Amino acid sequence: MAEGGGEARSGRARGRGREWGGGGRGGGRGRGGGYGGGARAPPPPHLAPAALARQGAEGAGGLAGGSPVRASFRVNARNATEGYCPVPELPADVLVRGPARQNRAVHGDVVALHLDPPTEWPAETLGGRGGQLGPPGPPPPSLSGLSLEEAAGGGGATELQRWGRHAEARGLRPTGRVVAVLEPSPRRACMVGFLERGPVGGGALELAPLDARLPRCRVLPRRGSGPHLPAAPSGTLVVSASLEAWRPEDRLPDARVTGVLGDARQMGVQARAILHQEGLSATHPPDFPADALACLPPSGLWEPSEADLAGRRDLRPWRVFSIDPPTARDLDDALSFERLAPGRLRVGVHIADVSHFVGEGTALDAEASRRSTSVYLVGEVLPMLPRRLCEQLCSLQPGEPRLAFSVVWEVDEATGDIRDEWMGRSVIRSCGQLHYAHAQHVIELPPGRAAELPEGAELAPDSPHSRRDVAEDIRALHGVAHKLRARRFAEGSLRLNNPKLSFRCDPHGHPLEAAVYVQREANELVEEFMLLANRRVAAVIAEACPGLAVLRNHPPPDRRKTAEVEALVARMGLPGTFCTSSSGAFQESLRRLADSAPLEVSSAVTLLSTKPMHLAQYFCTGSEAFAGNKALWRHYALAFDRYTHFTSPIRRYPDVLVHRTLAGVLGPDGRPRPRSSPAPAPEALARVEACCKHSNEQKLAARNAQDGSLRLNLSWLLKDRPMDVPAIVVGAGGNKWFDVFVHELGVEARVLIEDMVGVRAWFRDGALGLTAAGSPPNDKPGQPRRKVKDNPYGYAVDGALLPLELRLLSPLRVRLYGREVDSGRRVDVAARLLSAP
């Protein structure tokens, strides 16, 4: 889902776009296939910083004169000879084709990119836009630290925009070549792969990365206390490694093995590999450093002291309760409600005051900043904070006094309008830990029936509040949340409700059953108040501390990609117009589609709508790129001018920074002090900027690890228990494969044509055709028939299905199963074609 929904607690984006056309993977695993060209000439050395700065300062000819631009480098996982660099002013990612032009750049590097003249750009081909698209924003800074305009003699940005319009008008794909690596990718230090004997060079050891976007490497000899490596690796041994060097004359880079993870055929080894390749094994070790633990209060039962309570508003008499999943132990948010007078309500959001325990500049603060986020895997959590803080001292446990940061509103019951607001540090005592199911029970009670909590919903034993009162609070809060939600969507919020895979696990965390997590009105109740608190806090800190506030922005999606979704829905002939011109129009289009199309189809369109979306990012309002352009502060999906993260400090470090900022700008009355606008100290600004950058990287790594954990567990579950399910076609790779989306589990899976015994395929005009092998070819005369190889996964397709023509959003029925990949060394989710309507 885009961050119009899960931003309040733990939203996550999904997947990459796949389009019709394109080919399969090129060059096998890794990228060690030589430099191309008749002479196989190696690429030139990278330009030195002085040369880059000189080109930027002296490039009077602008881009045409050779001035490079700064860009991130991404590799196509299905064809590693294709690299892509997003440049905001250009309508499509810049294609960097072939090892020589990629010039030893690694997926995730920030590079200096030389753009070819537009006269050399090729025409776009069907499916040729497979590169990762980066977020739009300010012009990329030049290599000398100047702006693009300055680096290109005043004409760089204008020239880029002119080139971009030229490419868009003529349907061209920009191309370029890497001339230097400016910032090495973090993935260089956390590679994971199979240890193999190379075919050349005396059979030297080589690393075959699990991530096909990374290059195959030559393994350096063991050094010092490094791990012992087997003389004859089995081919299933998984190791971690770091890329040490890649010289221009070398076909393969050098890597040094840093650890041995084990046999890839074991599920636990695959799980560890996921963490290693995201760098989370380094940032989230099982144990916290001793100096960080020494910052905690002495062990034993903790009660707030008089010093702890000084300056806090005492809200312990208030009726406060939390609503969470039944498995939650880190309770960092709670709600309160009180009816002040007819039509006047008081609603409170109370957040664990983590910043009280995590002092700025302490060893614990450094460790929390390094981890930056909790990582949620199937059956396991890698916490940001020590468990004593997560689950005890900070967790808003019922019946216990807890330190909090509260936001309290007086609300008009009829309209949901906020009449008054207070923010500040507090002390609360929750009266109950409720589950979403408990709140949902109350919400679903008939309006005329007295509110009551269901069985199993217990309050703290010494709570002075009644079950009836808490149930009435839930009912009233639901009414306010409903008004807030309706207004938010009326003002343009967008929610991409992609189904979320979840598991029922045994007491040891092993998955027993997979299903889609169902979000209901109780979830939305909590979500609305968390969104409101985040929004209001963002407005306060952005106004009172404009130089150092940590906010969260979300750039608009790639317009060309959303236009493709519009065209796709139009071709389906569904009623109504599908419009993506704004977040509000997008939301209304999805709502109409959900009302008129089958669930699986509307869900697949929502998935395809997610793919053009960019990730939301933390940023500092004083950063050069943002300070002068507040339009960039906006959150597209939520349609908020200001937004931040305040409500989950137990598991997100930026929330801790926001708490500290808010505490610094509030007066004793809970209102912001008069704005002071001195420029922040350069050192302070640099620290906050670095924290935002690291938090963005860690959030993405945690999301990737969570997705990897979900898919890994599902693949092993399906290996023993395949599932027959409805599916929708969402992508294809020529006549080699097609991808399907399964709404029942919220997953994509690939169907390989080569598995279909006696079936041949053709691809033409955006359609994939399947016919019996004996049928006459329907595309080009004389095209050879596909040879059927020995295939343990081969199966016969029901002849009554053939011939079959598939397009995007074609409905099917498939069998999901766990397929061994990498020569039987790993398991992944795959699908077989069963039937079509």
Residue ranges and their predicted role:
Residues A2-I351, S355-P401, Q433, A450-P454, ...:
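Charge-lined substrate channels and their catalytic hotspots, especially those that engage the 3′ end
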Residues S225, G235, A245-E249, D263, ...:
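Electropositive polyanion-binding surfaces
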